[in-house]
A protein has these predicted regions:
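Subtilisin-like serine protease catalytic core
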Residues: 1, 35-37, 61-63, 85-91, ...
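Substrate-binding/access-modulating region of protease and related hydrolase catalytic domains
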Residues: 1-57, 115-117, 121-122
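Generic beta-strand/beta-sheet core signal
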Residues: 10, 41-43, 67, 97, ...
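Acidic, glycine-rich active-site loops and adjacent beta-strand->loop/helix elements
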Residues: 13, 44-48, 70-71, 100, ...
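Extracellular S/T/G-rich loop segment that most often corresponds to the catalytic His/Ser-adjacent loop
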Residues: 53-131
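C-terminal subdomain of the subtilisin-like protease fold in secreted/lumenal serine endopeptidases
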Residues: 135-212
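Noncatalytic modules at the cell exterior or secretory-pathway interfaces
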Residues: 212-215, 273, 282-306
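Extended low-complexity, serine/threonine- and proline-enriched intrinsically disordered segments
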Residues: 214-278
Length: 306
């Protein structure tokens, strides 16, 4: 049913996924998401008695929103399994409350309230939030995924990404949709075609001769994939540059990035490790600390996204 945009999958294999290849089940989910414009929210799978350690299929789906569990103290649940998948892709994407055996969450079943524990119960709560963003706020699947990741990460540096992904999603939907009084959010969505560049200029408030602000950006997209290519599984790469526009017309990205420029000296290893090349989720941000300083304004006061 193509009218259903969000599908929850609260099941998974007890076996670990291979380190350098995608599972058949995850590859099928990736194909369906890219082809039919749907979003699968997948439980991060559970471990029993400390094993296995790594995620089980289909939680290695690249396009899916993979959810691990935390306890009420915002720490990884005792049964949480870990990423990455395909050697370097960040999975899980997010974490949410899944309870512990001595402190379960309450789920609803056919006979009423039921004390529950597991990533299988955390994932549906995120699926509900994703469905609200898509059906009620009319966001695309990719934009809904990006917004959830951005809300989880916020201005913090992700910790323990192998088990918590980009962070814990806020409980209230208002915390995902709304910004504080000192924040501005821009959301861009569209369809990219092969070998094209897309440039956007964004007006950022200026105070005197500087920008008294910090910034962050989150990019999500659903690429075509090929399971026969091993760790080179994704066929599509979208590069992200976001920052001030210098006097030379180039974007001074928050994360220095000269890919695509004539003087590019970035090798493949660095591009993957530092710039997340071939990863379909990219998050770049400036740290928000007491030492954050205003930034110089160039001749063009706009910021650029490319």
């Amino acid at each position: 049913n193509q009218d259903i945009k969000v599908w929850n999958i609260s099941l998974g294999s007890m076996e670990e996924v291979p380190r350098n290849s995608i599972s058949p089940e995850a590859a099928l989910l990736d194909k369906l998401q890219q082809k039919y414009d749907v979003l699968f929210v997948v439980a991060g799978t559970n471990q029993e008695n400390g094993e296995p350690t790594y995620l089980g299929s289909p939680a290695d789906s690249i396009n899916a929103l993979v959810v691990n569990a935390v306890n009420r103290n915002n720490k990884p649940a005792s049964y949480t399994r870990r990423g990455p998948v395909l050697s370097f892709h960040h999975k899980p994407d997010l974490a949410y409350y899944g309870g512990e055996s001595n402190d379960p969450i309450i789920a609803c079943c056919g006979t009423g309230a039921y004390p529950a524990v597991g990533t299988s119960f955390a994932a549906p709560l995120i699926a509900r939030k994703a469905a609200y963003l898509i059906y009620k706020m009319h966001l695309s699947c990719e934009l809904a995924k990006a917004l959830l990741i951005d809300a989880a990460c916020a201005w913090t540096t992700p910790e323990d990404m192998d088990r918590l992904g980009y962070g814990i999603v806020p409980v209230k939907i208002e915390q995902i949709l709304e910004t504080s009084n000192d924040e501005i959010r821009f959301m861009l969505s569209g369809v990219a075609t092969e070998r094209d560049n897309y440039n956007f200029n964004i007006p950022i408030p200026v105070s005197g001769a500087s920008y008294p602000s910090v910034a962050r950006a989150t990019l999500c997209y659903f690429p075509k994939c090929n399971r026969n290519q091993g760790v080179d599984y994704t066929d599509t790469e979208l590069d992200l540059h976001f920052g001030r526009i210098g006097n030379d017309g180039r974007i001074k990205s928050l994360l220095p990035n000269n890919q695509g420029e004539e003087d590019c000296t970035t090798d493949e290893e660095k591009a993957r490790k530092k710039l997340r090349k071939w990863d379909n989720v990219k998050h770049i941000a400036e740290p928000l600390t007491s030492r954050s300083k205003p930034k110089k304004v160039y001749a063009n006061p706009m910021w650029g996204i490319m």
